[in-house]
């Protein structure tokens, strides 16, 4: 069994994964949404303090598994440095105390392997990764061969939802709230510019779109009413998704990978899933989706990725493991 820890942002999570059949024997996550909601976004220092309280509580429930553990795994990159440290320090202490090997896991690779929590691994694979911190197109040939094709030059897809929700005083996290409002809105009422429309490169930008939403709100004579909020959300979501699809289309036209996937917390957006399904059909690629329960940050996906490292004997010394807020690659 592998005990895995996730604390890269504002979710405290620990999981136990069985080596033989990849079964998840234990998984628990404590969200911090209510604590960060008044601030309209994650406050790193607050998140770190909450991890320091939540992780030990979850770990107590894992004690019965300790005698059968074969390794400890932890997210060490990328993420908020102060929150990553909470998980890494716990993992180091466990590895040393229990005399177990330590596995460092890239958080983004964890999201990729959330696809394979309930199905077999399938490669080669083109992936759209969308979360609160990242927006990327990846090409994965295997566990150790993952190429970053393109990424956002500024805000991420998920982050832009949070910021639009804050502009409209809708609350936090913004993703599910904006999606809910968009379902009842008219996307044609407030036309918004498609980012990087004339650029023939696989890259993303959401800062201009975010500013366009701000200008729409400022153009109204009064603060937006509920229907105007719905219409703004509908227009924003439709434009943001169209931007993703346009850039993915550019790359997929050049790729021979038989599989297409979408991962990350924002991949739970049903409108985006539907558009990706259509995109996959257009290019003759089978769309792979992570279970909705494992789209957001969680330790189960970290454990699943750690199984691959364990099989390769890719361990890290507890005395040498450090956190890396940014990651140059996924290999």
Swiss-Prot record:
Which EC number(s) does the record attach to this protein?
Answer: 2.3.1.234
Q: Tell me which residues bind Fe cation.
A: 107, 111, 297
Q: Which cysteines are joined by disulfide bonds?
A: none
Location within or outside the cell: Cytoplasm
One GO term (biological process) = tRNA threonylcarbamoyladenosine modification
Q: Where does substrate bind?
A: 129-133, 162, 175, 269
The cross-references to Gene3D superfamilies, in alphabetical order and at most eight, read: 3.30.420.40
Which GO CC annotations does the UniProt entry carry? cytoplasm
A single GO molecular-function term is:
iron ion binding
Q: Which UniProt keywords apply?
A: Acyltransferase, Cytoplasm, Iron, Metal-binding, Transferase, tRNA processing
Which reaction equation describes what this protein catalyses?
L-threonylcarbamoyladenylate + adenosine(37) in tRNA = N(6)-L-threonylcarbamoyladenosine(37) in tRNA + AMP + H(+)
Q: Which domain of life is it from?
A: Bacteria
Residues crossing the lipid bilayer are none
NCBIfam families xref list: gcp_kae1 (TIGR00329), T6A_TsaD_YgjD (TIGR03723)
Entry similarity comment: Belongs to the KAE1 / TsaD family.
Role played:
Required for the formation of a threonylcarbamoyl group on adenosine at position 37 (t(6)A37) in tRNAs that read codons beginning with adenine. Is involved in the transfer of the threonylcarbamoyl moiety of threonylcarbamoyl-AMP (TC-AMP) to the N6 group of A37, together with TsaE and TsaB. TsaD likely plays a direct catalytic role in this reaction.
Name of the protein in its database record: tRNA N6-adenosine threonylcarbamoyltransferase
């Amino acid at each position: 069994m592998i005990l895995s820890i996730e604390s890269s942002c504002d979710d405290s999570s620990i999981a136990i994964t069985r080596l033989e059949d990849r079964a998840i024997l234990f998984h628990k996550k404590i969200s911090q949404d209510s604590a960060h909601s008044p601030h309209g976004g994650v406050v790193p220092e607050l998140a770190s303090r909450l991890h320091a309280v939540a992780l030990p509580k979850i770990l107590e429930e894992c004690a019965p598994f300790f005698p059968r553990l074969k390794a400890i795994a932890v997210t060490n990159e990328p993420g908020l440095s102060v929150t990553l440290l909470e998980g890494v320090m716990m993992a180091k202490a466990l590895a040393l105390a229990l005399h177990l090997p330590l596995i460092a896991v890239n958080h983004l690779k964890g999201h990729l392997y959330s696809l394979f929590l309930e199905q077999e691994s399938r490669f080669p694979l083109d992936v759209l990764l969308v979360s609160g911190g990242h927006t990327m197109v990846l090409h994965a040939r295997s566990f150790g061969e993952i190429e970053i094709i393109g990424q956002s030059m500024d805000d991420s897809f998920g982050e832009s939802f949070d910021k639009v929700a804050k502009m409209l005083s809708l609350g936090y996290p913004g993703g599910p709230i904006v999606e809910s409002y968009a379902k009842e809105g008219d996307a044609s009422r407030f036309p918004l510019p498609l980012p990087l429309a004339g650029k023939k490169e696989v890259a993303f930008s959401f800062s201009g779109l975010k500013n366009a939403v701000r200008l729409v709100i400022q153009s109204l004579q009064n603060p937006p009413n509920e229907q105007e909020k719905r219409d703004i959300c509908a227009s924003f979501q439709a434009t943001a998704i169209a931007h993703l699809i346009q850039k993915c289309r550019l790359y997929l036209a050049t790729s021979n990978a038989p599989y297409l996937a979408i991962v990350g917390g924002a991949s739970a957006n049903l409108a985006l899933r539907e558009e990706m399904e259509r995109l996959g059909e257009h290019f003759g690629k089978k769309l792979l989706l992570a279970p909705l329960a494992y789209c957001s940050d969680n330790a189960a996906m970290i454990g699943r990725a750690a199984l691959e490292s364990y099989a390769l004997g890719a361990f890290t010394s507890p005395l040498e493991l450090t956190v890396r807020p940014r990651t140059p690659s996924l290999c």
